[in-house]
Amino acid sequence: MTHELISLPYAVDALAPVISKETVEFHHGKHLKTYVDNLNKLIIGTEFENADLNTIVQKSEGGIFNNAGQTLNHNLYFTQFRPGKGGAPKGKLGEAIDKQFGSFEKFKEEFNTAGTTLFGSGWVWLASDANGKLSIEKEPNAGNPVRKGLNPLLGFDVWEHAYYLTYQNRRADHLKDLWSIVDWDIVESRY
């Protein structure tokens, strides 16, 4: 199976100023493209040659895992945003967040803290288990909650390439601003 670079569901400048056009061009067009290209090269002749991304991320190690993890992570990341979205989740996901975290604001605070305190590069995820129980997962480097049998719902990239062109070392500010472009309909559909 050949893995493809996903198409963005919006124009490259649509998420500005939260995610600048230049950041999207580098992040999607160069970083993600490289992960996809490397993954396709690395899986040739392996047990993963015809596997889907989730399976590869769950079962692989080393370079295959790193490139598959980053491909899966970025596919989820780029498709969860839309210009003019934001707000709070509704429906079952909104209810579960309120129940488990006390309120949406408390959830955001805990999520942002997880993202700002993750040392080095990685991801912070809202994930659910098979019973719908939510958790905030800090994943270093290319990690994804699927490795723990969890379903990733919402992921914020805390690798510096995700924010440095606009925010420099202000990771916390970037995380706070991302909430204004989250498409909760997409995130809810993953729950």
Swiss-Prot record:
**GO molecular function annotation:** metal ion binding; superoxide dismutase activity
Locate the residues binding Mn(2+): H27, H74, D157, H161
Keywords (alphabetical) are: Iron, Manganese, Metal-binding, Oxidoreductase
Q: Which Enzyme Commission number(s) are listed?
A: 1.15.1.1
PROSITE patterns, A to Z: SOD_MN (PS00088)
The chain's disulfide connectivity reads none
Q: How is its activity regulated?
A: Inhibited by hydrogen peroxide.
Q: Which domain of life is it from?
A: Bacteria
Catalytic activity annotation: 2 superoxide + 2 H(+) = H2O2 + O2
Its subunit composition reads: Homodimer.
Tell me, what does this protein do in biology?
A: Destroys superoxide anion radicals which are normally produced within the cells and which are toxic to biological systems. Catalyzes the dismutation of superoxide anion radicals into O2 and H2O2 by successive reduction and oxidation of the transition metal ion at the active site.
List the protein's name: Superoxide dismutase [Mn/Fe]
Q: Give the source species.
A: Porphyromonas gingivalis (strain ATCC BAA-308 / W83)
Query: What gene makes this protein?
Result: sodB
